[in-house]
Amino acid sequence: MGREFDALFDEWSRSYDQTVTGHDAEYEEVFYQYDKILDAVRDRATGFVVEFGPGTGNLTGKLLEKGLKIIGIEPSANMRKIAQKKHPDVKIIDGDFLNFHVQEKADTFASTYAFHHLTDEEKRAAISLFHTRLKAGGKIVFADTVFETEEAKQEMIKEAKARGFCRLAEDLETEYYTTIPALSSIFEENGFDVSFRKMNRFVWLMDAKMKGA
């Protein structure tokens, strides 16, 4: 899954918590209402949760507060160390959306700010895999940067460049940010009913339930 980004996140691990709390002007709007976004994912998660890309463990903490059983799947070694230090009682293992070794089927797959590391074809493969690894009635609850149309994405890139936000513009151009229609098709094709809720200018909450549940 986009393991080409591992080195970037190993480096970012040192300042990630400062970025998400609004201390980086370029990413301030991306992480606007970050805490509420995490709360929205937590509120929809139930039962045994497999969390992809826990990073420094911020969503993990909220899931723990709710009393949920969690396993974290994190490809960045440095991020794993930080998350494990914050939450020593949580199992956080190496892996990614397409490669994870969890014996028990999950009630919820949860993730924030990570699904865009996969190409659309990889996203399709991941959602197909998730359908086989969820319990009956299971769900996927993700929050990530998504765009309503490809044109909206290009406009956001132009705006970032005009504001001198070179890192943000490069991020939007090089990672695999997709559109709501593309994601809707992927979920529907793989047996999920999905809804989208806009959380800020960049991030949407995706709540997908297995059909027939």
Identify the function of each model-found stretch.
Residues 1-44:
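Conserved class I S-adenosyl-L-methionine
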Residues 47, 107:
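Conserved acidic residues
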Residues 52-99:
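Class I SAM-dependent methyltransferase SAM/SAH-binding core
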Residues 110:
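A conserved beta-strand element that flanks and buttresses the S-adenosyl-L-methionine
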Residues 113-114:
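Short catalytic micro-motifs in class I SAM-dependent methyltransferases
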Residues 124-136:
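A short glycine-rich, Lys/Arg-flanked "PGG" loop and its adjoining helix->strand segment in the class I
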Residues 143-190, 196-197:
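C-terminal alpha-helical "lid/dimerization" subdomain adjacent to the S-adenosyl-L-methionine
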Residues 190-213:
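Core SAM-dependent methyltransferase catalytic element
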